[in-house]
């Protein structure tokens, strides 16, 4: 997934396409484009940027489909910087919906029906909260 859906991979694809002549408000920034700038351009309605974000959602959905068919987690939580604004952003909402739709198209129907894909709600504190939860559990075991 890192090769296709990470911030650096998205920026590299954007740079390649912009240098090849893609029509976007980001054209002048081809050499220095970032995933954050792609999100900002998409938020301004840049059609090319939205398309690249959709493509990224499809790549992520392929990875999610593979993982879900392997371990059947029931819940897939997306977090980190590559959520294009998350649930608070129309671009983030579009990104999530595209992932869900692409996942459903690629999955067995019964697997898709039993799987929820959503954004993480804990934000940047998720790691700390998880570590605290593990510490608490281990402490309680020692009593």
Regions found by a protein language model. Give the residues of each.
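ATP-binding/phosphotransfer module of carbohydrate and carboxylate kinases, centering on a glycine-rich
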Residues: 1-143
């Amino acid at each position: 997934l890192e090769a296709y859906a990470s911030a650096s991979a998205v920026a590299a694809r954007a740079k390649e396409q912009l240098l090849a002549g893609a029509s976007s408000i980001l054209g002048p920034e081809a050499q220095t484009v970032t995933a954050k700038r792609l999100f900002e351009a998409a938020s301004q309605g840049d059609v090319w940027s939205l398309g690249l974000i959709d493509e990224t959602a499809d790549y992520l959905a392929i990875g999610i489909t593979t993982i879900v068919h392997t371990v059947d987690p029931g819940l897939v939580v997306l977090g980190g910087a590559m959520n294009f604004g998350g649930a608070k952003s129309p671009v983030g909402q579009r990104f999530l919906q595209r992932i869900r739709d692409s996942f459903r198209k690629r999955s067995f129907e019964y697997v898709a029906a039993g799987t929820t894909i959503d954004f993480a709600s804990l934000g940047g504190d998720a790691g700390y909260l998880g570590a605290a939860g593990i510490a608490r559990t281990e402490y309680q075991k020692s009593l």
